[in-house]
């Protein structure tokens, strides 16, 4: 059976891995997932990720989770725009997470980026997820 929400699946794997104090989690690779992980790494929510390719043309992303004093850096990670209900915002209505302590990740015409980058570049888009 086909996966209906691949990005939501990746976020759930990260959330579950952090709850179980795993050092890393893996997920099937895609360009969107890699761009979201780029933003999470740039913002300091994960240590990094690497792409592992298999011989049959499939690839997997291995995500290294980050902890600070034994607690996960990611307290909350949630999907906002879902396959059944897409959420689009203009630059003026980009939501703040936890009064600016967290980030919102958006897919814009200029690429996948964090909320503060979208405000700087004056661009709106689809709200993919929020992280705190």
Curated annotation (Swiss-Prot):
GO-annotated molecular function: rRNA binding; structural constituent of ribosome
* Membrane-crossing segments per the record: none
Cellular component per GO, a single term? ribosome
Q: Which GO terms describe its biological process?
A: translation
Q: Which family does it belong to?
A: Belongs to the universal ribosomal protein uS8 family.
Subunit text: Part of the 30S ribosomal subunit. Contacts proteins S5 and S12.
Could you tell me what this protein is called? Small ribosomal subunit protein uS8
The organism encoding this protein is Sinorhizobium medicae (strain WSM419) (Ensifer medicae)
Q: Name the gene for this chain.
A: rpsH
